[in-house]
């Protein structure tokens, strides 16, 4: 069971680039479409959404870039560094805001990412 916990922790801490690579591997080598997993995630999230205590005790957050603000170049560079994406991919992600920068991040990490992005001039939301 501890191996599964380690795997789950590694999975939660993947960067956006690593998630994209994982999706490509699952699709190419195993025929699993990433969209097939989406209903499972939505269904799981919906079941917990009705419990107000669970919402108050949330420990993992999605870091959502709402806009780059006035310092777009600084935000693109920071997104590149934080996610491990290439410069073009980071720029595309910033241009497509609102977009998640990191999903399922522990509370401390999510708050740290939010403060770094806000210091660079971005508008960020934790969900």
From Swiss-Prot:
Coiled-coil segments: none
CC per GO annotation: cytosolic large ribosomal subunit
Species annotation: Amoebophilus asiaticus (strain 5a2)
InterPro entries per the UniProt record, alphabetical: Ribosomal_bL12, Ribosomal_bL12_C, Ribosomal_bL12_C/ClpS-like, Ribosomal_bL12_oligo, Ribosomal_bL12_oligo_N_sf
Protein family (similarity comment): Belongs to the bacterial ribosomal protein bL12 family.
GO biological process: translation
PANTHER family listed in its UniProt record: 39S RIBOSOMAL PROTEIN L12, LARGE RIBOSOMAL SUBUNIT PROTEIN BL12M
Function: Forms part of the ribosomal stalk which helps the ribosome interact with GTP-bound translation factors. Is thus essential for accurate translation.
Annotated region (Disordered), positions in chain: 98-127
Single GO molecular function: structural constituent of ribosome
Claim: Ribonucleoprotein is one of the keywords in the record: yes
Quaternary structure and partners: Homodimer. Part of the ribosomal stalk of the 50S ribosomal subunit. Forms a multimeric L10(L12)X complex, where L10 forms an elongated spine to which 2 to 4 L12 dimers bind in a sequential fashion. Binds GTP-bound translation factors.
Pfam families: Ribosomal_L12, Ribosomal_L12_N
Source lineage: Bacteria, Pseudomonadati, Bacteroidota, Cytophagia, Cytophagales
Gene it is expressed from: rplL
Keyword DNA repair in annotation: no
Domain of life: Bacteria
Keywords of the record: Ribonucleoprotein, Ribosomal protein
Name of the protein: Large ribosomal subunit protein bL12
């Amino acid at each position: 069971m501890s191996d599964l916990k380690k795997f789950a922790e590694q999975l939660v801490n993947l960067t956006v680039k690593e998630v994209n690579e994982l999706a490509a591997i699952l699709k190419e080598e195993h025929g699993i479409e990433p969209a097939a997993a989406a209903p499972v995630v939505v269904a799981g999230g919906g079941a917990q959404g009705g419990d107000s205590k669970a919402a108050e005790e949330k420990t993992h957050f999605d870091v959502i870039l709402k806009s780059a603000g006035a310092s777009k170049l600084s935000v693109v560079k920071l997104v590149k560094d934080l996610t491990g994406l290439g410069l073009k991919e980071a720029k595309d992600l910033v241009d497509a805001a609102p977009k998640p920068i990191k999903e399922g991040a522990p509370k401390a990490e999510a708050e740290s990412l939010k403060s770094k992005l806000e210091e660079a001039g971005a508008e960020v939301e934790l969900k």
